[in-house]
């Protein structure tokens, strides 16, 4: 699949003349393996060296070109002159009582993002950010209060995975990636696609199965079909309401792409065999948790290969919404279940360290002295 060599990061990160070895060094992780092979070919170096270099970067997690002992010294010298191996700095770490870990990453320009490592029964899931801040303005999300600062580069997206992997004990396994952290992934489309290429590269990349990678969108409709053609990762859609008036209030993007437009994009989304779209539904007391809402949701999802992830609202300081009581949550779930939908109720983890759904804000002051 063809990818653009250039990515759409902030001006200071734009790659200029990367095919020219005299350009300023750039982070090599901003390239797909295929584009790096093109660069090697342009410098009269056998393209198969791209496989070797990427294995060093993402399988062996080398931090310098000198560690790449099966690459000749002249090639290593050229690589060191042309590229840098970027690594994100973990500025702070917090651990929840339930074992959830939240990482505050410091970027090269001084900005901060957060990632969350979520413990499951026998593995971990990493929630990854794709932007510094977010422009979507969802009423229930703390990231929205930060506003949009910039897109993350491919290196900064994959760097969160590498950073988390480095903290794992030998017996701990990271098997799942969810692009559900700070930012709207489809608003940073090119960089996200480039990073997914590396994350899901089973030979020389981070080696995650596409079945274990999920991208969540607020409903940026024009980018949905291209996503389905570019990758087979799982799609999750943050729906959160069953009528346009409520969704307009919760998610301003609905004024541009209302529910009927969003769901039509879901109906025509190029799903792989036996896959379903996950519809995320944050339950807020008195807002979208009634029996009528549940019945409308059933009607809306007809003819879509769908499953539903119910997320009881995670209350936080200054929040305008409340979590429904357990009876309301169970009633909503049962209505969907009785209509043969696969329904999960997300068990919120990390709420005591503001690491649960909707709570990421990269507020360094909340970390205190906890390293």
UniProtKB/Swiss-Prot annotation:
GO BP of this protein: rRNA base methylation; tRNA methylation
Residues noted as binding S-adenosyl-L-methionine in the record, renumbered to the chain: 183-184, 216, 238-240, 314
Compartment(s): Cytoplasm
PROSITE patterns: RADICAL_SAM (PS51918)
Cofactor binding, per record: Binds 1 [4Fe-4S] cluster. The cluster is coordinated with 3 cysteines and an exchangeable S-adenosyl-L-methionine.
UniProt keyword Cell wall biogenesis/degradation present: no
Every Radical SAM core domain range: 120-352
Database matches in HAMAP family: RNA_methyltr_RlmN (MF_01849)
Listed name of the protein: Dual-specificity RNA methyltransferase RlmN
Species for this entry: Desulfosudis oleivorans (strain DSM 6200 / JCM 39069 / Hxd3) (Desulfococcus oleovorans)
Lineage, broadest ranks: Bacteria, Pseudomonadati, Thermodesulfobacteriota, Desulfobacteria, Desulfobacterales
């Amino acid at each position: 699949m063809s990818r653009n060599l250039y990515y759409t990061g902030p001006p200071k990160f734009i790659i200029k003349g990367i095919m020219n070895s005299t350009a300023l060094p750039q982070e090599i992780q901003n390239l797909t393996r295929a584009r790096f092979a093109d660069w090697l070919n342009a410098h009269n170096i056998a393209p198969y060296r791209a496989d070797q270099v990427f294995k060093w970067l993402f399988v062996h997690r080398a931090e310098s070109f000198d560690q790449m002992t099966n690459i000749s010294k002249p090639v290593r010298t050229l690589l060191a002159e042309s590229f840098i191996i970027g690594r994100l700095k973990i500025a702070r770490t917090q651990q929840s009582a339930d074992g959830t870990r939240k990482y505050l990453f410091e970027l090269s320009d001084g900005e901060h993002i957060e990632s969350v490592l979520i413990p499951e029964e026998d593995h971990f899931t990493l929630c990854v950010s794709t932007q510094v801040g977010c422009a979507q303005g969802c009423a229930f999300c703390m990231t929205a209060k930060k506003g949009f600062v910039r897109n993350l580069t491919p290196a900064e997206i994959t760097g969160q995975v590498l950073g988390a992997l480095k903290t794992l004990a030998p017996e701990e396994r990271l098997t799942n990636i969810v692009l559900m952290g700070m930012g709207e992934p489809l608003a940073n489309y090119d960089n996200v696609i480039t990073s997914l290429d590396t994350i899901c590269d089973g030979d020389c990349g981070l080696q995650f199965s596409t079945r274990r990678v999920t991208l969540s969108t607020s409903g940026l409709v024009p980018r949905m079909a291209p996503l389905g053609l570019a990758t087979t990762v799982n799609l999750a859609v943050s729906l959160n309401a069953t009528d346009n008036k409520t969704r307009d209030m919760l998610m301003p993007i609905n004024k541009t792409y209302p529910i009927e437009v969003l769901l039509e994009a879901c109906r025509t989304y190029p799903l792989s065999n036996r896959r379903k779209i996950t519809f995320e539904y944050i339950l807020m007391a008195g807002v979208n948790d009634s029996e009528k809402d549940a019945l409308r949701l059933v009607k809306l999802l007809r003819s879509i290969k769908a499953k539903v992830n119910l997320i009881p609202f995670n209350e936080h300081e200054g929040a305008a919404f409340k979590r429904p009581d357990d009876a309301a949550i169970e009633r909503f779930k049962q209505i969907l279940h009785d209509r043969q939908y696969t329904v999960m109720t997300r068990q919120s983890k990390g709420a005591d360290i503001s690491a649960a759904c909707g709570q990421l804000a990269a507020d360094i002051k909340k970390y205190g002295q906890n390293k």
